[in-house]
Amino acid sequence: MKNYFNSLNFRQKLINLQKCKLIDNQFLSEKNNVLKGKNIVIVGCGSQGLNQGLNMRDSGLNISYALRDDSIFNKNQSWINATSNGFFVGTYENIIPTADLVINLTPDKQHEQVVNVLQKFMKPNSVLGFSHGFNIVEVGQLIRNDITVIMVAPKCPGTEVREEYKRGFGVPALIAVHSENDPHDIGFEIAKSWAISIGSHHAGILHSSFIAEVKSDLMGEQTILCGMLQASSLVCYNQLIFQGVNPSYAGKLIQTGWEVITESVKHGGITLMLDRLSNTAKIRAYFLSKKLKKIFFPLFRKHMDDIISGEFSKNMMFDWKNNDQQLKEWRTEIQNTDFEKCNIYYKQIPEQEYFDNGLLMVAILKAGIELSFEIMIETGIKEESAYYESLHELPLIANTIARKRLYEMNLVISDTAEYGSYLFSHAAIPLLKKFMNELQPGDLGNKISTSELDNITLYKVNAKIESHPIEIIGKKLRLYMTSMVPIKTK
């Protein structure tokens, strides 16, 4: 097998990277007739598998689960997840041959082996679904010619797919049909129906390609979505302790602060996030953000370059063969940090205090969102896709940190995302530590003192914030998010 993306010529690569179009609401119907009455079998019952299945069942679809023989015999966590929620569970041999749509939601590292087995049992002219295109794009696995291959990629961890659905909303999703496997020209309608069934029509469904999804997804999760949040949590916490802040308060300010601050981003972009600051704080955050962008630009671009070239995938797959040795080392290292082990702060922190005492956190978010977006765009990825991967998914990741800190985030994201996040944060932490030497009173841990304002400076800062391309595309895309529900902070 070989990297599918690297086998294409330059023109084909560009066409695939640039494929991303928001589907108008008038073409999305909750009736979902295409998959009604069909046998849908989900392979794997982890975070994505369970939560997508719950949403699909609640949308009136017939869902069952295929698990390995040993998973059923040993009654492992996947078996518990499925059976405790009332789903029928069977072996590959027993239920895959009955399926009209087989959705493979096992971890990326298992895809090659799992898909080889699935193809032996799938009936002629059936459909194979993925929620991440890594195996197709980076591994280059070939699928039987009669099988239609589709993808629905929710832009968040599986837990948030369910939570947003229960709120009556949903999470954005990219849908795609593998151009090498659509023999009956039915892939698009089936993928669209699947996306509707998990609630994504409430937030936005984008018609994309396997390649655009993989390259943008890897970039987003490695940098701003997971890697930057991880590195910033650890460094900001240590900085607060250095400043003499109560450790448990510092822990809560960081742990819950990301969720509170990014909730404003979800509803009104970077503009609203900075509007939550005083004018003095906004100007300070703006200029801190400019410095951070300059510092982090080479690292963000390196990650994008390694994703495009396949270098990242090659190195990660080598670690797979090495029994995840590097992944496990990084995982243990993060779990043993002071931030992860600090005591819980039980007092309520007022919402505005997170903004007032987290000015640096606001600056970090602004810098990371804009950098991730800008570098995706210069690589050929469309603005719509770059927006979801650098901004909209951010509060959904922050929600996981708010629950059980970085442990929860790393638990619910994929192993691929976790590996990439550790890779980025390992390089980002020294840069952030050095940047802490530039902090002034009011940047982190306490409120900045109000100072005399220059009207012209404030006007120019506001104009710069509002005119950034991610703010322009964000206003357009948020018009489709008609049922967005605010999250209440505890």
UniProtKB/Swiss-Prot annotation:
Residues 209-344, 345-484 form the KARI C-terminal knotted domain. Pathway: Amino-acid biosynthesis; L-isoleucine biosynthesis; L-isoleucine from 2-oxobutanoate: step 2/4; Amino-acid biosynthesis; L-valine biosynthesis; L-valine from pyruvate: step 2/4. GO terms for cellular component: cytosol. SUPFAM superfamilies: 6-phosphogluconate dehydrogenase C-terminal domain-like, NAD(P)-binding Rossmann-fold domains. Substrate binds at S414. Keywords: Amino-acid biosynthesis, Branched-chain amino acid biosynthesis, Magnesium, Metal-binding, NADP, Oxidoreductase, Repeat. The active site is at H132. Its EC number is 1.1.1.86. Residues 15-208 form the KARI N-terminal Rossmann domain. Its cofactor is Mg(2+). InterPro entries: 6-PGluconate_DH-like_C_sf, 6PGD_dom2, KARI, KARI_C, KARI_N, NAD(P)-bd_dom_sf. Mg(2+) 2 binds at D217, E389, E393. One of its GO terms (biological process) is L-valine biosynthetic process. Mg(2+) 1 binds at D217, E221. It is an enzyme of class 1 (oxidoreductase). NADP(+) binds at C45, G46, S47, Q48, R68, S78, D108, K109, Q110, G158. Binds 2 magnesium ions per subunit. GO terms for molecular function: ketol-acid reductoisomerase activity; magnesium ion binding. It comes from the Bacteria. It catalyses: (2R)-2,3-dihydroxy-3-methylbutanoate + NADP(+) = (2S)-2-acetolactate + NADPH + H(+); (2R,3R)-2,3-dihydroxy-3-methylpentanoate + NADP(+) = (S)-2-ethyl-2-hydroxy-3-oxobutanoate + NADPH + H(+). HAMAP family: IlvC (MF_00435). Belongs to the ketol-acid reductoisomerase family. Involved in the biosynthesis of branched-chain amino acids (BCAA). Catalyzes an alkyl-migration followed by a ketol-acid reduction of (S)-2-acetolactate (S2AL) to yield (R)-2,3-dihydroxy-isovalerate. In the isomerase reaction, S2AL is rearranged via a Mg-dependent methyl migration to produce 3-hydroxy-3-methyl-2-ketobutyrate (HMKB). In the reductase reaction, this 2-ketoacid undergoes a metal-dependent reduction by NADPH to yield (R)-2,3-dihydroxy-isovalerate. This is Ketol-acid reductoisomerase (NADP(+)). It comes from Buchnera aphidicola subsp. Melaphis rhois.
